[in-house]
Amino acid sequence: MSFNDKAAEAVASGDIGVGWLLSDQCEVFWNVGSWEGANPCEILTEWKKSAMTPITIAGLKFTIIGKTPERLVSTNIGGQGHIVGAKCTNYPGYLVCWCPATVGPNIAYSVIQKLADLVKA
């Protein structure tokens, strides 16, 4: 199944609320949903920093659970969901998504990573 098909399934099932496929230079090549005030480039910039400081997006603070160059998992302790990212393995970019709190952060990462693996250059 293609990236677009699997992404549509993840959105329909409620695993993803908002998502962006970003190049390393922060060009948006795909997006789904909208989040007023959210800037995916801010998320990517914070992800690339070595510090484990919280990420604030559109006024919401997300605490970092795990962060490596290939993986970002953060959660809002107030129950406002998760910011999750995965570096694409077959494309020079990143898939960054907001996932609702009803999806656990590690499950959300699993979904996002599988999608990121489907992205082709």
Swiss-Prot record:
The UniProt entry's sequence similarity note says:
Belongs to the Asgard profilin family.
The cellular location(s) given in this protein's UniProt record come to: Cytoplasm, Cytoskeleton
Task: Cite the GO molecular-function annotations of the record.
Answer: actin binding
Q: What does this protein do?
A: Binds to actin and affects the structure of the cytoskeleton. At high concentrations inhibits spontaneous rabbit actin nucleation. This strongly suggests this archaea has a profilin-regulated actin system, and actin-type genes can be identified in this organism.
Q: Which UniProt keywords apply?
A: Actin-binding, Cytoplasm, Cytoskeleton
This protein is called: Heimdall profilin
Main location class = cytoplasm
Q: Give the CC-aspect GO terms.
A: cytoplasm; cytoskeleton
